[in-house]
């Protein structure tokens, strides 16, 4: 998916300080901006999902994940999204003084459609209205970022 082929949609998402700091550190090392690195990471993860297909995406710990046999997991490529609890640990704190940084993600229509499919797959309360309208993409975005090697290597800490 080529982001430059169509006008990107800007979606600002707040990242917790730990996730942002990992991205910012990589950006400093590469001499780039944190937003550029964050957008590249998200695009890479979305491309992996697109290549594998949404039908081969599963949320860790979900009924579908638990029903998969070892053969299912080893025989085909799967994209395993973090569980809701893991994602929530890495969302910005709403407490007073909770530090977070906003990153503007520039997404193609195809990427937004794929993120919306991921939101529906995650099935997290308050992300989709009763009428089926997507309320927020942040759980999907943070889940994909957490699957990236750079973010995973930063360790298991809460924001």
Question: What are these language model-derived features?
Answer:
Residues 1, 120, 157-159:
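Short intrinsically disordered terminal tails
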Residues 6-25, 66, 100-121:
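Short amphipathic alpha-helix starts
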Residues 14, 18, 37, 82, ...:
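Alpha-helix boundary/N-cap detector
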Residues 30-58, 127-159:
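Short, basic amphipathic alpha-helical segments that act as recognition/interaction helices
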Residues 82-95, 113, 120-124, 130:
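Charged, low-complexity interaction tracts
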């Amino acid at each position: 998916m080529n982001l430059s082929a169509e006008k990107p949609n800007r979606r600002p998402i707040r990242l917790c300080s730990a996730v942002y700091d990992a991205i910012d550190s990589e950006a400093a090392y590469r001499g780039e901006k944190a937003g550029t690195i964050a957008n590249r990471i998200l695009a890479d993860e979305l491309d992996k999902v697109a290549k594998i297909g949404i039908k081969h995406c599963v949320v860790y710990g979900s009924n579908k994940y638990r029903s998969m046999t070892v053969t299912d997991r080893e025989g085909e490529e799967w994209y395993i999204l973090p569980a809701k609890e893991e994602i929530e640990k890495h969302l910005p704190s709403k407490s007073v003084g909770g530090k977070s940084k906003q990153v503007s993600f520039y997404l193609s229509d195809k990427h937004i459609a794929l993120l919306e499919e991921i939101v529906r797959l995650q099935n997290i309360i308050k992300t989709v209205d009763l009428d089926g309208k997507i309320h927020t993409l942040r759980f999907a975005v943070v889940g994909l970022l957490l699957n990236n090697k750079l973010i995973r290597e930063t360790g298991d800490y809460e924001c």
